[in-house]
């Protein structure tokens, strides 16, 4: 299914969720189904995890390179979490939107709240069914230490409180159901006449 063409500026969608909620999986499903939807690739100063590819999963750069980009105002938004920077290229997002592509930023709630003040976008929060289920998912993906999982769970509680500032909330209890809701939001927002009511 196509959503628009190159004659209309693409929309901006912000998707946030605690780590392990399935936000990246859901966004990847959208990108696979809709040729005019593209997910932004964030810059980060953290080391790649096993199997991650520079330029596909993230742009992995040094802290000094990241700070130079901050000084040059290259980021649409950026945050520092757990001593690691994450940021979104301002220029890349604008180019994609001018080409008529709908851009999805998968970012944390801090970055999303920054953007609410700066640009028109649709904000979507993905919620886990429970914190216990989230803990199980984080343990089962086996990418982080128990100490980091505990930090992520503490952060998740704060992120869940930020959901009230989003336009939509989806509970990811069943991946296919959550995807159908996310897909419906994307289609409805594309057909919206005006964001300002």
Swiss-Prot record:
Catalysed conversion reaction: GMP + ATP = GDP + ADP
Domain Guanylate kinase-like as annotated: residue spans: 10-187
GO CC annotations on file: cytosol
Key words, A-Z: ATP-binding, Cytoplasm, Kinase, Nucleotide-binding, Transferase
EC number: 2.7.4.8
Pfam families per the UniProt record, alphabetical: Guanylate_kin
Residues the record lists as binding ATP: 17-24
InterPro entries assigned: GK/Ca_channel_bsu, Guanylate_kin-like_dom, Guanylate_kinase, Guanylate_kinase_CS, P-loop_NTPase
Keyword Cell inner membrane: no
Keyword Kinase: yes
Major location category of this protein: cytoplasm
Cellular compartment(s): Cytoplasm
GO molecular function: ATP binding; guanylate kinase activity
Function: Essential for recycling GMP and indirectly, cGMP.
Family statement: Belongs to the guanylate kinase family.
NCBIfam families in the cross-refs: guanyl_kin
UniProt-recorded name of the protein: Guanylate kinase
Source organism (scientific name): Protochlamydia amoebophila (strain UWE25)
Gene: gmk
């Amino acid at each position: 299914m196509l959503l628009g063409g190159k004659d209309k500026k693409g929309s901006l969608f912000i998707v946030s969720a605690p780590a392990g909620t399935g936000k990246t999986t859901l966004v990847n499903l959208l990108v696979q189904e809709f040729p005019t939807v593209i997910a932004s690739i964030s810059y980060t100063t953290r080391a790649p995890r096993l199997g991650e590819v520079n330029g596909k999963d993230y742009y992995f750069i040094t802290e000094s390179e990241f700070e130079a980009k901050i000084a040059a105002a290259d980021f649409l938004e950026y945050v520092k979490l757990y001593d690691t920077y994450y940021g979104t290229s301002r220029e890349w997002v604008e180019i994609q939107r001018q080409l008529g592509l709908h851009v999805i930023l998968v970012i944390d709630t801090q970055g999303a709240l920054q953007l609410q003040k700066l640009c028109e976008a649709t904000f979507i929060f993905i919620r886990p069914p429970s914190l216990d289920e989230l803990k199980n998912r984080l343990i089962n993906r086996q990418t982080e230490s128990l100490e980091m999982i505990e930090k992520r769970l503490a952060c998740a509680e704060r992120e869940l409180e930020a959901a009230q500032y989003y336009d939509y909330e989806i509970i990811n209890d069943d991946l296919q159901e959550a995807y159908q809701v996310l897909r419906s939001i994307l289609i409805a927002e594309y057909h919206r006449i005006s964001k300002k009511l």
